């Protein structure tokens, strides 16, 4: 089960804000919640047998998917603090700081080739993201039946691998330019020949 909770303070409704007529709206929000990622398919945990004709054009049964009974949802916990509002009847803004921690990350873990598989999706590893989001919007023209609006978004995200599988501190995914290193961001790398 996943859940979330939040608190909103409508600062503009406070008595001390009455003298600031140029501030149309001002809110402060804090939220915390959990969510999951179920990108494992409907039968991702089951051992499956399938038919093939790859051997001398004769039909045969093969192990199509290795059983993975411990496979479960990836879990995320997220905390955010947001300040948003509207100024001068035209300019709106939102500033948000967030921290998201992912555990039981779904990753293709290397598997012995003697099994007939090169990897198996497992719940291993952890990742932490933190950063800020800034959104600005401005109503350039506003009529009864039309409006022209401009907006801009800015995001800064800092990600860090917190845990890998089998006690590893580094893992380079074969045939890609992606590496996971504990304590570092998920990164692209170029090998030196």
Predicted regions: what they are:
Residues 1-11, 26-32, 79-85, 91-99, ...:
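Membrane-embedded beta-strands that build the outer-membrane beta-barrel scaffold
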Residues 23-71, 99-123, 163:
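Surface-exposed extracellular loop regions of Gram-negative outer-membrane beta-barrel proteins
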Residues 38-41, 130, 136, 172, ...:
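Basic, gly/Ser/Thr/Pro-rich low-complexity segments located predominantly at protein N termini
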Residues 1, 17-18, 71, 124:
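Alpha-helix capping and helix-loop boundary segments enriched in small/acidic/polar residues
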Residues 122, 139-193:
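Conserved small-residue
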């Amino acid at each position: 089960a996943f859940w979330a909770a939040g608190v909103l303070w409508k600062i503009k409704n406070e008595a001390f804000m009455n003298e600031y007529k140029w501030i149309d709206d001002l809110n402060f929000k804090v939220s915390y919640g959990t969510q999951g990622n179920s990108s494992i398919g409907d039968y991702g945990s089951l051992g499956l047998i399938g038919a093939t004709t790859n051997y001398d054009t004769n039909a045969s049964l093969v192990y199509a998917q290795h059983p993975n009974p411990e496979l479960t949802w990836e879990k995320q916990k997220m905390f955010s603090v947001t300040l948003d509002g509207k100024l001068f009847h035209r300019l709106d803004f939102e500033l948000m700081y967030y921290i998201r921690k992912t555990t039981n990350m779904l990753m293709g873990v290397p598997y012995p080739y003697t099994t007939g598989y090169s990897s198996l999706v497992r719940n291993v590893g952890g990742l932490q993201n933190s950063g800020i989001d800034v959104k600005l919007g401005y109503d350039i023209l506003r009529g009864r039946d039309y409006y022209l609006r401009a907006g801009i978004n800015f995001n800064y995200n800092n990600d860090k691998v917190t845990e890998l599988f089998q006690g590893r501190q580094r893992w380079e995914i074969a045939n890609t330019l992606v590496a996971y290193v504990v304590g570092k961001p998920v990164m692209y790398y170029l090998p030196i020949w």
